[in-house]
């Protein structure tokens, strides 16, 4: 097993980590020196192979228990005798679905890894320390940077976001925008960062600065909505919450994406797939999509990821943004003066082989005709610094040795990458405490905060909670509702007794056993606080339904996780929902990961109460329905009236669908809150 380098002391008493194992404090090991001086010293010591490894940002799948393998080897799929991945999972022993290489760190000099899964906090902390020990045993001891897509929401998509794993859940980023409260967003982002730091994750592959101007696009839940000004405010708060006011040892660095704006996808198709290779700018509105990035740069975003797609119709080169010198050098470097790390979106260069399941092509949109070495040279000429998802430093070495790329160009990128490692304090201490990790992740305070953000993001679209609160009051029985039970997701947490997001009506005298509720997609334990479950609407006093926004099911290992296509409920489903509403007073909450067409749920045939949510626990939705808790959220995009209106709108222009049912910025009336009836803009 690797031996952790000891903490030594310089002759003047300065403590340092002896990363190159020579017993002397070299300038790059000296914590007193300016970052730029340390970077220059380390860069001068590196071989071309070591530099090339630093420019690869691979993937990693830790074992489920975080236990290092007996031989000390590292595999990029979490080997320790138990590979796994999509369809298997870490530690399951199923066939690996990610490429393995026990020498990624030691031989290939790769020391950036995006985590494809995260084991429980203590296990993840142990794994981080094992990885850092492996890095410390290399010639120069350059520490590893572990990164991750979002892990604090409700979406589970292996290519874009994750949920669970013990982290405190808030709504999706679109729900953060729905709170319209930058102070609350910054507080939640800071809590998120603290949990990530506790397990060793120091680079966030988020936030998204893209605008939700094309309603069909599958990635809208990861954005801050359609309004560029609101998105800018949210980005400022989120980045400052994650990083602080400057990048240092208390920060989680943010990689803002997908420059210069991924929202205007042609026909709403996502650029992970060939159908979404191009964007559309019929409104010539690129400048509008740059505005949220300007806010991110002003907030100090450390890194940037360009999008896969071709910015067609903008006057920029007709190649994907990661290959596009007009985008990376012209816009990002020269116009905006950005000198941080630019990392390509993942597997834009070589694609990905998933043994036994699928081969995912490179998202090399616009340069498919080029060979892989030619693509690499094009990327480097464009100005990128790291290759997302790639573990092929030999291609970079070959490009330099062939004369296609100068080593000074490689040095410029390595300098940026090293700078962030030093600023994050990784050279001083990349380790975390496994015994403290579990108590620091998912604390009562951060869970309460996450639930508060969830509650604040709920948007009242139409109707009133009055039929449901009345039904509770008029059912005879004993007072069984205690008003503030503990969070059902963390029943041992007494701190949740004060959760302001879990309020009910403490004066309600009804016995839950006497209120018959027909429910769909709601946990029975949460519903038991308010009523007993019945099997059909006809048996019920009231009905409460939680629905996903409509989408078209797609085939394919990854594409099935992307909600794309039509935003309308199929006719049969719309008729079924209206039949439930006709049978009994009904509340419907729709998870708006995209701007759904909710026309069938409006008017007299619709529900008594219609809510838009962006990821919220069942009991919080039920509190809004039964408890009279105000619906405070602000709609972060227009909700269109029809798919025809969507098809006729321009992908790059906000608020462009004709006669939307609800406008961006809609909020349920104040005053009586959920008791007051309100309606769409018909």
Language-model segment annotations:
Residues 47, 127-139, 162, 229-389, ...:
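Second-shell residues forming the walls of enzyme active-site clefts
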Residues 1-19, 71-78, 82-90, 95-98, ...:
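C-terminal non-catalytic regions of proteins with extracellular/luminal or membrane-system context
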């Amino acid at each position: 097993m690797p031996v952790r380098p000891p903490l030594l002391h310089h002759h003047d008493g300065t403590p340092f980590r002896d990363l190159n194992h020579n017993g002397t404090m070299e300038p790059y090991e000296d914590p007193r020196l300016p970052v730029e001086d340390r970077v220059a010293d380390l860069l001068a010591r590196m071989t071309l192979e070591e530099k090339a490894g630093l420019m690869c940002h691979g993937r990693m799948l830790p074992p489920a228990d975080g236990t290092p393998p007996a031989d000390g080897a590292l595999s990029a799929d979490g080997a320790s005798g138990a590979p796994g991945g999509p369809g298997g999972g870490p530690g399951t022993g199923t066939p690996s679905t990610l490429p393995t290489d026990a020498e990624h760190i030691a031989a290939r000099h790769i020391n950036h890894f995006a985590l494809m899964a995260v084991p429980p906090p203590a296990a993840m902390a142990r794994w981080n320390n094992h990885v850092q020990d492996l890095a410390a045993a290399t010639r120069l001891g350059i520490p590893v940077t572990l990164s991750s897509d979002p892990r604090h929401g409700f979406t589970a998509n292996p290519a874009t976001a994750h949920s669970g794993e013990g982290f405190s859940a808030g709504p999706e980023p679109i729900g953060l925008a729905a709170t319209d409260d930058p102070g609350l967003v910054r507080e939640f982002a800071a809590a998120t960062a603290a949990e990530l730091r506790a397990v060793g994750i120091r680079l966030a592959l988020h936030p998204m600065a893209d605008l939700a101007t094309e309603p069909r696009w599958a990635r809208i839940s990861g954005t801050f909505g359609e309004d560029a000004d609101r998105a800018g405010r949210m980005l400022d708060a989120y980045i400052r919450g994650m990083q602080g006011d400057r990048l240092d040892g208390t920060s989680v660095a943010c990689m803002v994406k997908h420059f210069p704006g991924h929202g205007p996808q042609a026909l709403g198709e996502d650029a992970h797939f060939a159908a979404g290779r191009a964007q559309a700018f019929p409104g010539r509105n690129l400048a509008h999509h740059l505005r949220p990035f300007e806010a991110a740069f002003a907030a100090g975003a450390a890194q940037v990821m360009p999008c896969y797609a071709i910015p067609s119709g903008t006057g920029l080169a007709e190649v994907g943004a990661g290959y596009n010198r007009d985008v990376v050098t012209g816009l990002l470097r020269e116009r905006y003066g950005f000198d941080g790390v630019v990392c390509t979106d993942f597997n834009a260069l070589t694609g990905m082989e998933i043994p036994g399941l699928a081969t995912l092509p490179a998202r090399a949109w616009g340069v498919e005709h080029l060979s892989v070495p030619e693509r690499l040279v094009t990327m480097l000429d464009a100005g990128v610094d790291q290759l997302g998802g790639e573990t092929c430093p030999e291609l970079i070495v070959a490009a330099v040795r062939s004369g296609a790329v100068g080593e000074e160009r490689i040095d410029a990128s390595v300098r940026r990458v090293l700078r962030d490692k030093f600023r994050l304090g990784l050279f001083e201490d990349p380790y975390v405490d496994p015994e403290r990790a579990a108590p620091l992740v998912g604390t009562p305070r951060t869970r309460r905060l996450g639930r508060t953000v969830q509650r604040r993001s709920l948007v009242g679209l139409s109707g009133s909670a009055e039929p449901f609160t009345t039904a509770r009051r008029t059912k005879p029985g004993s007072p069984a509702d205690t008003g503030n039970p503990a969070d059902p997701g963390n029943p041992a947490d007494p701190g949740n007794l004060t959760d302001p997001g879990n309020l009910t009506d403490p004066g309600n005298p009804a016995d839950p056993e006497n209120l018959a509720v027909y429910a769909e997609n709601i946990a029975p334990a949460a519903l038991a606080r308010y009523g007993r479950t019945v099997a059909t609407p006809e048996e019920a006093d009231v009905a409460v339904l939680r629905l996903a926004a409509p989408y078209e099911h797609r085939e394919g290992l990854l594409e099935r996780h992307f909600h794309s296509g039509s935003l309308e409920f199929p006719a049969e489903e719309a008729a079924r929902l209206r039949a439930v509403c006709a049978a009994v007073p009904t509340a419907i909450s729709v998870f708006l990961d995209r701007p759904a067409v909710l026309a069938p749920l409006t008017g007299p045939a619709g529900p008594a109460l219609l809510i838009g949510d962006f990821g919220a626990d069942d009991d919080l939705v039920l509190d809004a329905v039964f408890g009279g808790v105000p619906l405070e959220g602000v709609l972060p995009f227009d909700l269109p009236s029809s798919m025809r209106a969507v098809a006729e709108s321009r992908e790059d222009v906000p608020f462009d669908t004709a006669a939307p049912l609800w406008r961006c910025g809609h909020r349920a009336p104040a005053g009586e809150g959920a008791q007051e009836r309100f309606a769409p803009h018909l």
